[in-house]
């Protein structure tokens, strides 16, 4: 299967997105959330997790699809909190902004890559 097109964010939307992200970041910080920046690349095993992500929408970046572009942020943040932040006092308040990727099959032999901006918060644990 080959990629036939990339749906990117339009230049006219970049400034609007930047303003929205800046406003959201201010709100996140007011509520005590810390910014993290998860990797664009993950193993397919990590992304698939417990079957929440549809493997057919994941964009593999090597021939055997063992590595892929992130289709969403939550999985990467959960992995971060359970590894590098394992000893951090709970609850952990994290926020992130960035691009996520998925693919849409256009026909039997090709797909379109969709690049989307995502912003969100994760509250991990409790008091």
Where are each of the predicted segments found?
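TRNA-recognition modules of translation machinery and tRNA-sensing kinases, especially anticodon-binding
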Residues: 1-127
């Amino acid at each position: 299967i080959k990629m036939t097109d990339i749906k990117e964010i339009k230049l006219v939307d970049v400034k609007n997105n930047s303003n929205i992200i800046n406003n959201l970041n201010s709100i996140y910080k007011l509520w005590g959330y810390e910014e993290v920046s998860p990797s664009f690349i993950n193993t397919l095993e990590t992304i698939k997790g417990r079957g929440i992500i549809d493997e057919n929408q994941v964009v593999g970046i090597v021939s055997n699809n063992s590595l892929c572009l992130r289709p969403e942020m939550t999985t990467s943040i959960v992995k971060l909190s359970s590894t590098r932040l394992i000893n951090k006092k709970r609850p952990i308040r994290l926020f992130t902004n960035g691009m996520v990727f998925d693919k849409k099959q256009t026909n039997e032999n090709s797909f379109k890559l969709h690049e989307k901006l995502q912003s969100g918060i994760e509250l991990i644990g409790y008091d």
